[in-house]
Amino acid sequence: MIKWLQRAGCLSAHAVVPQAPAAASVQGRHDLAFDTISNARDLGGLAGAGGRRVRQGRLYRSGNPALASAADLERLQTLGLDMVVDFRSPGEKSPEEAAFGQRFHWVAAPVLEGSMAMDVLMPRLRASTPAQMDAFMLEVYGDFPVRYREAFAGFMRTAQGGKTLLFHCTAGKDRTGFAALLLLAALGVAQDDILANYLESNQRNAQFNQTALARMAGLGVAPAVMTPLLEVRASYLDASMRAIDAGWGSVDNYLRDALEVDVAQLRGHYLAG
């Protein structure tokens, strides 16, 4: 699946992904006006199978919404969400988030359980080089379709029910990005558009990332070491695709055989036109 890298103009695993989103993604996205929920967007508008487009107002992705402002929570409630799917592990959550679960049907589907907790990450970050952190992220993405297959299968089963969904992790880029790949691939969205949607996180999280770099520098983590953890890179998504190709031969096979997705049913729910 090296074409994912070539199309993004990113032939090196260490190359920095361009910050500007691709035109196809700009045309297909529907921005959400949140002040305290990062990386939030509607997947509606992207071109899918058979000349149809992904329905707006049905599939949303974001960073963690659970500590949002009161105004943003009110805005979130207007979306008519049937369910909010959280890919974070228990160690990434705080007690202050409990109130969110009282307002929304909030379902845990933990991926990378334990791996992203700060007490686990900090020793790794302090001991690693930028190249080692890049390799760590490639390993993480390679694990998504294999080690965490059941979590993503459960997510796809939920989507197959035709629910209006918001799905998120912490920054809405890695676990959420892979989940978006699965959904959009099942809906027949072109690989270029899937990749462009994935890479948008760099622009959308730019302020979040700068704040994180400054905070972590104060804790003894060099910006160059932290950057691979904060960015999305075409090479990361390619690691997932390579794992899928190695185990199942194609994304279509993975969706059908590993996740048992009914693609026709999904398209009936989420494609318009």
UniProtKB/Swiss-Prot annotation:
Endpoints of the signal sequence: 1-15
A Pfam family name for this chain? Y_phosphatase3
E.C. number, please? 3.1.3.48
Q: What class of enzyme is it?
A: hydrolase
* Keyword Plastid recorded: no
Positions annotated as active site in the UniProt record: 169 (phosphocysteine intermediate)
Extract one GO molecular function annotation from the record. Answer: protein tyrosine phosphatase activity
Q: What are the UniProt keywords, alphabetically? A: Hydrolase, Protein phosphatase, Signal
Q: Known catalysed reaction(s)?
A: O-phospho-L-tyrosyl-[protein] + H2O = L-tyrosyl-[protein] + phosphate
Which chain regions cross the lipid bilayer?
none
User: Which family, according to UniProt?
Assistant: Belongs to the protein-tyrosine phosphatase family.
Q: What is this protein called?
A: Putative tyrosine-protein phosphatase H16_A0669
Q: Which organism is it from?
A: Cupriavidus necator (strain ATCC 17699 / DSM 428 / KCTC 22496 / NCIMB 10442 / H16 / Stanier 337)
